[in-house]
């Protein structure tokens, strides 16, 4: 046909802000508030408010183009003529574009500093402690050639860290307490959801290493369980011993399935190669170390820097656990709005009781994704609903337990590093 186009290139575009004035609206919506309709009036108000004070820079980045024909095939080909194959190809195309947008999105100074402060779950840090908390993360991003803004690269200097803290204080996200012996900075519970807007712009760069940490811990525990079973005589009954490396990959697959509605993953084989490369960067002999027993697995985990799974994965897992708790408590509930309402109330209760480490998990946005996952797993229909909902809750509780272990390890390391960095008397 005359004028026919054989291919279309989709250009991934990422837009990142140092700060946005509307993060408070984002937080209110996450708490269960209503979302304002977006039209020309909203756009005018957005531009006017964004220009009302200095919120920093806007970063526009263009990724590697995606060829539509590489997924859909030639015009009139088998994929184009098969509705099911065409639908799947379009889904894969969308995921590839989204993944490339994420890969091209630069990490900002705002994102790095809020990530460090959110990891403290409301506890304050001195200026020196903020800089110490930034060090490992910045080294990691540098070693992986992750794109960063000039402001993020400048965080090796004290002046850039101070400027970022001051900007976040002015933006109402960070609180400064300066009337004591040492000034300190924190993100209080009332601002944690707003701060996640910035933190979430970088966590996809940390996702694979976060999954690796949890999988290493699971592999070590499987080896320990196998050893206990062998001591009890049950291993000889079955004649088989679980392979820790197999347990590692099983856990990667399970976590990928758990988080598939939150993150854009590459195709399974490609993602497996990415995970293997990530582990090799931490330790080229990681497989043999996993097979050396639980103690070696613990040493492997302890040597991974930085430890990030409690920062990257915990907010999602704890939000899912709240929804699972609601579903397990009442196996007759089926309305999404009822589940979200009950989960919001339960989350606020658990925060007050300190059964949740942070209020950022109490988010209607995360609860909606949790409901997607629950429906995907058939937890709103079928037989044995109560038992399957209880099993889902138990799975998430066990994952939270392992996140607690990694967080405790990260805190002990941070304290050790902080003591080592103190000047001698």
Language model feature labels by segment:
Residues 1-425:
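Membrane-interfacial terminal anchoring regions of lipid-handling membrane enzymes
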């Amino acid at each position: 046909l005359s004028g026919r186009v054989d291919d279309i290139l989709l250009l991934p575009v990422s837009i990142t802000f140092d700060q946005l004035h509307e993060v408070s609206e984002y937080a209110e919506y996450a708490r269960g508030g209503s979302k304002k309709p977006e039209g020309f009036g909203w756009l005018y108000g957005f531009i006017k408010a964004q220009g009302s004070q200095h919120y920093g820079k806007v970063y526009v980045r263009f990724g590697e183009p995606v060829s539509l024909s590489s997924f859909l095939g030639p015009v009139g080909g088998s994929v184009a003529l098969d509705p099911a194959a065409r639908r799947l190809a379009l889904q894969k195309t969308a995921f590839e574009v989204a993944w490339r947008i994420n890969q091209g999105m630069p990490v900002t100074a705002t994102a790095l500093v809020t990530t460090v402060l959110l990891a403290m779950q409301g506890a304050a840090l001195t200026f020196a402690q903020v800089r110490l908390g930034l060090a490992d993360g910045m080294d990691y991003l540098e070693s992986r050639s992750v794109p960063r803004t000039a402001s993020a690269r400048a965080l090796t200097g004290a002046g850039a860290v101070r400027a970022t803290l001051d900007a976040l204080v002015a933006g109402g996200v960070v609180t400064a307490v300066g009337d004591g012996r040492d000034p300190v900075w924190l993100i209080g519970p009332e601002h944690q959801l707003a701060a996640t807007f910035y933190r979430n712009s970088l966590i996809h760069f940390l996702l694979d290493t976060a999954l690796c940490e949890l999988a290493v811990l699971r592999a070590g525990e499987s080896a320990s369980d196998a050893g206990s079973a062998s001591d009890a005589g049950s291993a000889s009954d079955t004649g088989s011993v679980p392979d820790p490396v197999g347990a590692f990959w099983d856990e990667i697959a399970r976590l990928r399935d758990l988080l598939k509605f939150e993150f854009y993953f590459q195709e399974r084989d490609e993602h497996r190669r990415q995970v293997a490369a990530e582990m090799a960067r931490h330790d080229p002999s990681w497989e043999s170390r996993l097979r050396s027993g639980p103690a070696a697995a613990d040493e492997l985990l302890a040597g991974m820097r930085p430890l990030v799974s409690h920062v990257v994965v915990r907010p999602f897992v704890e939000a899912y656990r709240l929804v699972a708790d609601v579903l397990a408590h009442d196996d007759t509930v089926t309305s999404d709005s009822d589940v979200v309402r009950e989960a919001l109330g339960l989350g606020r209760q658990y925060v007050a009781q300190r059964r949740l480490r942070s209020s950022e998990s109490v988010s209607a946005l995360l609860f909606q994704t949790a409901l997607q996952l629950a429906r995907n797993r058939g937890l709103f229909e079928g037989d044995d609903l109560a038992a399957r909902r209880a099993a889902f809750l138990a799975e998430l509780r066990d994952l939270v337990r392992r996140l607690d272990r990694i967080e405790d390890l990260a805190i002990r390391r941070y304290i050790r590093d902080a003591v080592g960095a103190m000047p001698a008397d």
